[in-house]
Amino acid sequence: MTRASVHTVNGEVNNMITAKMIIDRDYTLARTDEKLFCSFVEPLGRCIYGGLYEPGHPSADEKGFRRDVLDLIRPLNLTMNRFPGGNYTSTFRWEDSVGPKEKRPRRAEVAWQCIETNEFGLNEFADWSRLNGSDVMMTVNLATRGVLEAMDCVEYCNLEGGTYWSDLRRSHGYTAPHGYRYWCLSNEIDGPWQVGQSTGTNYGLLAREASKAMKLVDPDIKTVLAGSSSPDMPSFPDFDVDAMNAAWDQVDYLSVHNYISNLKGDTPNYLAKPLTTDRFFKQIGGLFSYIKAKNHSAHDLFISFDEFNTWHTVSGNERMEKPRWGIAPPLLEDTYTMEDAAALGSMLITILRNCDLVKIACMSELCNCISHIRTRTGGGCWVLPPYYAFLHYSRYGRGVVLIPRIDSPKYDSRDYSDVPYLDAVPVQNDDGTITVFAVNRSLTEKMTLRIELRGFEGDYTPNEWITMSHPDPKATNTEDRPANVSPRKGTADIEDGILCADLDPLSWNVIRLRRQK
């Protein structure tokens, strides 16, 4: 195993890390799907109420959407948002959320022990999504409802008119259909916390019939089968195998989720956890091959990674620690830090490194709850450090992912061995620019990164280097100090055709190489 080298400066011994990356034009993985750059919106805590939607706020438009929050969301260039859940979906009656607001019922939302007013519903989310230029991935309830209700929802959303549900939508002021193409068939059905938990076989049979019926209403839709809530679930992979075996030819994606946390305060181990995400993807890929062969099918499934993030309240029971049956109480509002930005950056790198399998990715969630966008009710809004990692990923991560050769020093942590200090992936953007995303996992040592290009025509020079770090791994941003942790420009050099950049300890980096004209 390669370890850090030692050099002397002014008589003092210091550790020095050097990592090398070779990028060859001919070693390509796959083109990134546009749906890798998505988010997730759920009526949980203050994600919607007091987050995206706050009538009476100084920045709110005529529909109650906070324009200051939209100004933070638009730069993310989200292609799609999953809605409305999430655990919320398991008792969701979609009909409650449409029509005149004064006639919508208030419901006990048992997943998060709150009252759902249904003031912000299906059509409000359609309006909001149009404002930020994103599509909607709709989730239907197969936990406590069934095939007919799922069909009705597709009819309401996607048919032009001439039927009961499509005409009802038109009467609600939406003449044109929403035309949603992607539909999740419930959520985390394997979880014991879920209302309507089921076995893989029983759920798979129901999902198969629901998908078949929904596609009879609109043959253009794609459906997402609910898979494992986490790679740590005792039911994984049996639940996934049984569900896919029952539904394989009728569905198009398998939904999987993964959150990582630092509950034990062990940052080196925390930064290695995306290795579990990588292994999870590869295990799912193996299951795909097995079920396809078992069913003698020509049909393929792909991964919909439609919930992922870092999440430090994941082991708590926050919903039960607060008074029940409130309206949009603050829930799961983690204080995200610089170390979370590096950990999330590695998760995003892992998604890109598996983009031949992963075709949908929705970071959870978009505002306040498990989110990097924070608001104060009646006041301002600001972003937390991981926001920038996703911003850069969405802005520069589109194109063809290349397969690099990486030589990096490694370390061992509590749960992992041979963890590379350098986590990185290159993407060739459509304009020819090569973007390298890189995380230095070392908490104490700078890393000299040497990048060699092979097989590319012309000379490439560093066009831009964005870096983000902070001496304190727990540093964050607040309303009073919104730029405490934020990106800055770095300087990279070319030596004998090899790019050299010094990456700060615990840093997120975006290095962009452009061919000289």
Please annotate each region the language model reported.
Residues 1-12:
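Short, positively charged and aromatic/hydrophobic N-terminal segments
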Residues 10-239, 244-253, 277-278, 282-316, ...:
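Non-catalytic accessory regions flanking glycosidase/transglycosidase catalytic cores in CAZymes
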Residues 257-272:
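Active-site His/acidic residue clusters
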